[in-house]
């Protein structure tokens, strides 16, 4: 959030009228630097719009540098030694491989970042003050827009338990753009003992993101200057000396700018408080505006809802009125129709009454009629018994006929050539010349034809109805209680599934069989009740799968044998079907769940044996006999050889299991044909399931499907050979010689019995129907007349209720129209109020925006003045640093000259032995003492800015001079002993006075010479004065062995102390006289 600094909320409030009359000028767009600095909420930190450089982080300052979201890196520079991302809580690490513009010396720092809502807790730091640097870069939303990511940064010192808001709504992209670095440096933090630094990143819009965190030591600048107001305290004599004009001016400027800085800081704090108050008021105004906007939106929504309700009610009213008009017309038409019908019914009633009277007259005597009916009932009972006997004979004869045809019959069906086979040039290899007699021949190249004999041969032109017509007699056996099995055999692609299942428009054997079952069951429903249930399963890889199960079960299905000898599969779904539609749904569900695959022979090849089991439970209502039969409709998998399909993997395993089960079926067929005592039903799941329907009293029908193409001759011959083996079951030579004449007689007797039964039934049924029709007609007419009267009454009552409802609806319509008008008036008033409130809020918002703009302008002016003052202070600091630099250079030259002087003095002390030279040395020391006083006063002013360095130089200088003076004193003592032996004690004061006079003259000459000497010569004289000073002090404090020498020394020290004020006075004279002096 951008905080705009103002000059005072009170003044802005006072200038509201002026702001309304004259709109404030639009402020200039802030620079990226200013935009970033406006997001900083504490003084001290600064913003850098570039990457990290080598000089930004020195070895003695750097404590910890965290590569957020990245790994540790090693380098020569301290800034290049980045530690891996640690100390964090929450967030995710992200990286980018794009180039970082202006990334500095270490652009890799900005290739990774920590992203999300997270915080850092950095512990293990030594107590003290630190600088915190944060590195940012927008590496996710590199194309913006502005404002897509804004977040706050808060720093908490753990023991303080307070969060300091450092950055507010920082938008990196708005400041520098995408893939560009941004640094916030010099955030001040303090660490106490056993505490940590907590940095919290809080998202305002989007998720926060940081690339690096650097912690540096903060070096405190110690203030050791001993400068007072207008004076400098001398380190040597503790005397207050006057400042030079430049120093005085500098100190005044410094104090002046410090006061200005303090005032500006106070003003800035005051303006920040005022800005915060203004911002809070603006926020409250914005919140109030938002609240009013929400209320306005709610009012608009309410008005819209009211309008919608009114429109809806109006539509309902119109629809009700239209319905009423339509109903009114319909009821009028219905009433007219009913009146016409009533008239016609009255006419019919009169006619029926006349017919009833005629019938009553035509009916003979009632007793005769009763006798005739009783005789008819007796005849009916006799006919029923004969009918049951004939039915039993019919069943027996039907089964005899079926058994004469053979228990297992084989039908051969050949499909037509496909388009692909015709286009590939394949020809028909099947000869259908003897198809009517059941013969079929196969032409195999140049070899002779091979002929096969079957019960029925279907040509490619025969349809599904023709095929089923020969299989339908077996359906009757199922209803009579026999187990029946119908299965289709042949290679893949020969039409087995088409024959058994068919399509929705061209049904197969399965559907037609069930349809025939329901048809016959409907015909026999008066004498026999049937319950039909269907199960669909498949044998896939020698495993039984229930195709009607809603979800596949992991439990294997096994075949069990019941106590009565039948076989069943526990757990399989048996769907009870009541009509043919349910049958088709069950067949479709099973067909869709069947395993299908592709191979070289057929793209959609059935890879399992599909078995449809129809369970029929019958109960004879006449004699109570119950039967339970089973019909198996089996669509076998393809019988082609493995070499032809060329399959691998899972398809190979499927083909092997299919061939194994078909081989087991062939073994069962062979055992049945040869009448073996053991039939291997259990060698396969297929034969085990069909054990009840193969052999014994069961009946079986096999469809062998063949291909007419000469490309499939080998598979066709294999299928026909297998079918021939099946046909030989129960068809020995003796059974083929059936007496057809006797069979014809039996058929004729059966037909005559059926015709007699039909004639008797028809005559009986006609008599009964005539009686019942006469009675029912009379009753029906009466009941119909009563119903018509009741309907007329109901229609009249409904008409009355409709009229009443129409009246009430008209009243409601009038009330709704009134309410609608009231609501429209309320909506108009609400819209006017809302418009007025919105205009008032817009005015308030414009006023607040103009005030904020004025405050921003004033804040920028204050910041400009402050920057100017800071620039002036920096210039003064640079000048002071230059002066200090010149002073340090002069002192270094003075030290060099002092060292040279020490060496020369040592050589003079060893060579000069005469008293006269000693006197000259004493005179030089007095002059050096005077010059030392002068140089001390001047140097104290110059060295005031760097007292620590001056003090160090003086201490070293005094130690060196004290050592030199001790050496000179020792040599002078030895020489003084020799002089005292040759001279008297009385002459000592004269010598001292003469030395005093010479010292005064030399001091005056040195004072005049110092002004004209360069800096190097002045420093040399200053060094000599420093060397002479400790010797004088030592003479005044240490006792001497020669009493006469003590008197001279004390007088000399006294004279030296007396000349001190004179030297101070003469120090200021060279500025006036400017004379040039010479030193001997």
Curated annotation (Swiss-Prot):
Residues 960-970 have a biased composition (Basic and acidic residues). Residues 1-35, 960-1080 are annotated as: Disordered. Transmembrane segments: none annotated. ATP binds at residues 490-497. Keywords: ATP-binding, Coiled coil, Microtubule, Motor protein, Nucleotide-binding. GO terms for biological process: microtubule-based movement; microtubule-based process. This is Kinesin-like protein KIN-14E. Residues 971-985 have a biased composition (Polar residues). GO terms for cellular component: microtubule; microtubule cytoskeleton. Belongs to the TRAFAC class myosin-kinesin ATPase superfamily. Kinesin family. KIN-14 subfamily. InterPro entries: Kinesin-like_fam, Kinesin_motor_CS, Kinesin_motor_dom, Kinesin_motor_dom_sf, Malectin_dom, P-loop_NTPase. It holds the Pfam family Kinesin. Residues 1047-1059 have a biased composition (Low complexity). Residues 247-355, 736-893 form a coiled coil. The gene is KIN14E. Residues 407-729 form the Kinesin motor domain. It comes from the Eukaryota. One of its GO terms (molecular function) is microtubule binding.
């Amino acid at each position: 959030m951008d905080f705009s600094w103002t000059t005072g909320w009170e003044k802005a409030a006072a200038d509201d009228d002026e702001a309304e009359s004259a709109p404030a000028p639009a402020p200039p767009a802030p620079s990226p630097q200013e935009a970033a600095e406006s997001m900083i909420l504490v003084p001290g930190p600064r913003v850098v719009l570039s990457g990290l450089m080598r000089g930004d982080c020195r070895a003695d300052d750097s404590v910890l540098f965290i590569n957020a979201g990245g790994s540790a890196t090693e380098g020569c520079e301290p800034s290049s030694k980045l530690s891996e991302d640690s100390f964090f809580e929450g967030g995710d690490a992200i990286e980018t491989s794009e180039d970082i513009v202006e990334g500095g010396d270490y652009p890799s720092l900005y290739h990774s970042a920590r992203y999300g809502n997270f915080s850092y807790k950095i512990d293990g730091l030594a107590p003290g003050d630190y600088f915190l640097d944060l590195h940012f870069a927008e590496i996710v939303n590199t194309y913006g827009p502005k404002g897509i990511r804004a977040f706050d940064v808060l720093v908490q010192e753990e023991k303080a338990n307070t969060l300091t808001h450092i950055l507010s709504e920082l938008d990196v992209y708005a400041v520098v753009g995408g893939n560009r670095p941004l640094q916030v440096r010099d955030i001040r933090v303090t660490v106490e003992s056993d505490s940590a630094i907590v940095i919290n990143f809080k998202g305002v819009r989007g998720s926060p993101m940081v690339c690096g965190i650097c912690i540096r030591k903060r070096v405190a600048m110690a203030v050791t200057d001993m400068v007072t107001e207008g004076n400098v305290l001398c380190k040597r004599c503790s005397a207050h000396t006057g400042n030079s004009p430049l120093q005085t001016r500098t100190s005044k400027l410094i104090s002046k700018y410090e006061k200005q800085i303090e005032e500006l800081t106070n003003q800035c704090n005051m303006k920040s408080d005022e800005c915060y108050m203004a911002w809070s008021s603006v926020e409250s105004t914005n919140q109030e505006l938002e609240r009013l906007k929400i209320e306005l939106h709610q009012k608009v929504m309410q008005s819209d809802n009211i309008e919608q309700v009114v429109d809806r009610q109006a539509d309902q009213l119109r629809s009700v009125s239209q319905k009423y008009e339509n109903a009114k017309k319909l009821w009028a038409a219905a009433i007219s129709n009913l009146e016409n019908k009533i008239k016609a019914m009255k006419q019919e009633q009169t006619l029926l009454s006349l017919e009833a009277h005629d019938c009553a007259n035509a009916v003979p005597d009632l007793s005769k009629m009763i006798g005739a009916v009783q005789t008819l009932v007796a005849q009916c009972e006799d006919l029923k018994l004969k009918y049951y006997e004939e039915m039993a004979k019919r069943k027996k004869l039907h089964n005899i006929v079926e058994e004469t045809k053979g228990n297992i019959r084989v039908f051969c069906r050949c499909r037509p050539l496909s388009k692909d086979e015709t286009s590939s040039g394949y020809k028909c290899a099947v000869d259908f010349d003897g198809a009517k007699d059941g013969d079929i021949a196969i032409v195999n190249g140049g070899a002779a034809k091979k002929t096969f004999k079957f019960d029925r041969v279907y040509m490619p032109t025969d349809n599904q109805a023709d095929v089923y017509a020969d299989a339908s007699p077996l359906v009757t056996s199922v209803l009579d209680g026999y187990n029946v099995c119908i299965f289709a055999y042949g290679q893949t692609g020969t039409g087995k599934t088409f024959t058994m299942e068919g399509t929705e428009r061209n049904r197969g054997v399965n559907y037609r069989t069930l349809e025939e079952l329901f048809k016959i069951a409907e015909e026999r429903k008066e004498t026999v009740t049937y319950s039909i249930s269907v199960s669909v399963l498949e044998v896939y890889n020698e495993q039984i799968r229930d195709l009607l199960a809603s979800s596949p079960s992991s439990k294997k299905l096994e075949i069990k044998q019941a106590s009565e000898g039948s076989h069943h599969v526990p757990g399989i779904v048996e769907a009870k079907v009541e009509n043919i539609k349910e049958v088709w749904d069950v067949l479709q569900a099973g067909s869709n769940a069947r395993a299908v695959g592709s191979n070289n022979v057929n793209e959609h090849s059935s890879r399992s044996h599909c078995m449809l089991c129809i369970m029929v439970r019958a109960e004879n209502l006449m004699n109570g006999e119950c039967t339970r039969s089973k019909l198996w409709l089996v669509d076998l998998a393809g019988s082609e050889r493995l070499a032809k399909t060329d399959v691998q993997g899972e398809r190979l395993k499927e083909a092997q299991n299919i061939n194994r089960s078909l081989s087991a079926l062939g073994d069962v067929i062979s055992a049945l044909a040869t009448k073996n005592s053991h039939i291997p039903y259990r060698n396969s799941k297929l034969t085990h399931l069909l054990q009840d329907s193969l052999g014994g009293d069961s009946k079986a029908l096999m469809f062998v499907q063949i291909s007419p193409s000469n490309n499939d001759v080998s598979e066709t011959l294999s299928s026909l050979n297998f079918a021939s083996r099946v046909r030989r079951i129960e068809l020995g030579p003796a059974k083929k010689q059936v007496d057809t004449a006797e069979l014809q007689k039996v058929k004729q007797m059966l037909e005559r019995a059926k015709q007699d039964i039909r004639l008797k039934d028809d005559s009986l049924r006609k008599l009964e129907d005539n009686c019942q029709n006469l009675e029912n007609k009379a009753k029906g007419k009466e009941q119909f007349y009563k119903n018509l009267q009741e309907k007329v009454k109901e229609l009249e009552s409904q008409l009355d209720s409709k009229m009443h409802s129409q009246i009430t609806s008209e009243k409601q319509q009038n009330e709704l129209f009134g309410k609608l008008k009231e609501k429209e008036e309320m909506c108009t008033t609400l819209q006017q109020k809302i418009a007025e409130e919105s205009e008032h809020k817009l005015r308030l918002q414009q006023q607040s925006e103009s005030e904020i703009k004025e405050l921003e302008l004033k804040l920028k002016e204050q910041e400009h003045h402050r920057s100017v003052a800071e620039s002036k202070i920096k210039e003064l600091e640079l000048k002071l640093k230059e002066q200090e630099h010149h002073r340090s250079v002069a002192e270094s030259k003075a030290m060099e000259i002092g060292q040279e002087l020490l060496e020369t003095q040592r050589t003079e002390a060893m060579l000069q032995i005469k008293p006269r030279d000693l006197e000259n040395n004493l005179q030089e020391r007095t002059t050096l003492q005077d010059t030392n006083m002068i140089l001390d006063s001047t140097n104290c002013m110059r060295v005031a800015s760097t007292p620590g360095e001056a003090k160090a130089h003086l201490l070293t200088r005094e130690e060196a001079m004290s050592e030199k003076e001790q050496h000179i004193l020792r040599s002078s003592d030895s020489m003084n002993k020799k002089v005292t032996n040759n001279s008297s004690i009385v002459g000592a004061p004269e010598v001292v006075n003469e030395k005093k006079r010479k010292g005064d003259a030399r001091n005056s000459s040195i004072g005049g010479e110092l002004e004209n000497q360069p800096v190097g010569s002045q420093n040399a004289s200053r060094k000599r004065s420093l060397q002479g000073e400790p010797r004088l002090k030592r003479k005044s404090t240490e006792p001497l062995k020669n009493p006469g020498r003590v008197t001279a020394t004390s007088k000399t020290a006294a004279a030296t102390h007396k000349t001190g004020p004179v030297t101070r006075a003469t120090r200021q004279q060279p500025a006036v006289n400017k004379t040039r002096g010479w030193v001997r």
